[in-house]
Amino acid sequence: VNYPGLISSKYYDLAQQYLPEGQSGIVTFGLKGGYEAAKKVADETQFFSLLANIGDTKSLIIHPASTTHQQLSEQQQITTGVTKDLIRLSVGLEDIEDLKADLQGVLEKLPVQNLV
């Protein structure tokens, strides 16, 4: 999980310095199942809209390797921080319990070895 508000993030100190009141609702994470597992999660959520624009009032999900960065070579994707397993979430104003249940439902459909 990549999130600047986590102490384990390499951007934690910068986030605390520049965003002391809290960071954004944008989170990225990878799935062990790689490209197919990540694409399936992005495609099958119900409460998250499959859109590339982030920071909206509605919750968004994107699998960059199959959408916004698909025209790049694998090396170019890696250089830009996009891995095949990467999911990017932008959390909006929907009820957090609905969002969590949506993600949990999709993740539970994946084989156990494909989870984070």
Tell where the protein language model's regions lie, with residue ranges.
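Conserved small-domain helix->loop->beta segment predominantly found in fold-type I
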Residues: 1-46, 52, 72-78, 115
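Electropositive phosphate-/nucleotide-binding environments in soluble metabolic enzymes
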Residues: 32-35, 51, 93, 97-100
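PLP-dependent enzyme catalytic core of the Aspartate aminotransferase-like
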Residues: 59-116
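Functionally constrained cores in energy, signaling, and assembly domains
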Residues: 2, 42-45, 57, 93, ...
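Surface-exposed, low-hydrophobicity interaction/linker segments
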Residues: 43-65
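Active-site lining segments that contact anionic ligands and/or coordinate catalytic metals
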Residues: 22-26, 56, 84-86
